[in-house]
Amino acid sequence: MDLKATIRTLPNWPIEGVMFRDITTLLQDPAAFKEAINRFYDRYRTMKIDKIVGIDARGLIFGAPLAYKLEVGFVPVRKKGKIPFRTIGAAYSLEYGESMVEIHEDAILKGERVVVVDDLIATGGTVKATIDLVEKLGGEVVECAFVIDLPDLKGREKIRDYKMFALMEFEGE
C-alpha cells in the first residue's frame, strides 16, 4: 500500500509558504491506518522494547495502538499543564518563543528501553525535548519513529545521536 498517497497536502496552511502534511486522511482510511501501525510493529516486534512514548498530540494516535500491539506500556508526553500528578518538563524553541512538554516523573524506570513516536519530524524541537525527559528519568531511547519526515527542515540534525525511522518523506518545507 502506498501510504504516502493517503496524506493530504494543504498549501499555505496555517501560514503562507507552508505545505501542511495532513495525516487525518490516513487516519480516516482504516486499511492505511492499520498498515501504518503494522509497519511500525514489524520494525519493533523483535527489539527489546519496554515502553512506547507518544508525543502530544498526534504521536498519541500512533503510539498507543503500537504499544498495545507490542504488548508494552504506553507513556504520553503532553504539552505543559495537560497531565495530572507530579511531572518533569523540558522546553523547546518555537519560531516565536518557547513551549514545554511534560511527563509523569514515574512514567519510565531506570534502564527501560523506549521508542519515541510522533506523527512527523520537522525542526526536531519537540522530539529532542522528549528524548531529554526520557533520559532524565533513566530511560534509553532505542529509536525515534515518525510517520513523516520533512528532511528539508533538518529535524534529524537535532537528534543525530539517535536512531530514527520514518514511514515516508516529503521534500520541501
Swiss-Prot record:
Signal peptide: none
Alphabetized CDD domains for the sequence: PRTases_typeI
KW Transmembrane (keyword) present: no
Family label: Belongs to the purine/pyrimidine phosphoribosyltransferase family.
Pathway given in the UniProt record: Purine metabolism; AMP biosynthesis via salvage pathway; AMP from adenine: step 1/1
Gene Ontology molecular functions: adenine binding; adenine phosphoribosyltransferase activity; AMP binding
Entries under Pfam families matching the protein: Pribosyltran
Subcellular location(s) of the protein: Cytoplasm
Main location: cytoplasm
Protein name: Adenine phosphoribosyltransferase
Keyword annotations from UniProtKB, A to Z: Cytoplasm, Glycosyltransferase, Purine salvage, Transferase
Gene3D superfamilies in the cross-refs: 3.40.50.2020
Taxonomic superkingdom: Bacteria
Known EC number: 2.4.2.7
Gene that produces this protein: apt
Function of the molecule: Catalyzes a salvage reaction resulting in the formation of AMP, that is energically less costly than de novo synthesis.
Claim: Transferase is one of the keywords in the record: yes
GO terms classed as biological process: adenine salvage; AMP salvage; purine ribonucleoside salvage
Catalytic activity from the UniProt record: AMP + diphosphate = 5-phospho-alpha-D-ribose 1-diphosphate + adenine
GO cellular component terms listed in the entry, alphabetical order: cytoplasm
Assembly description: Homodimer.
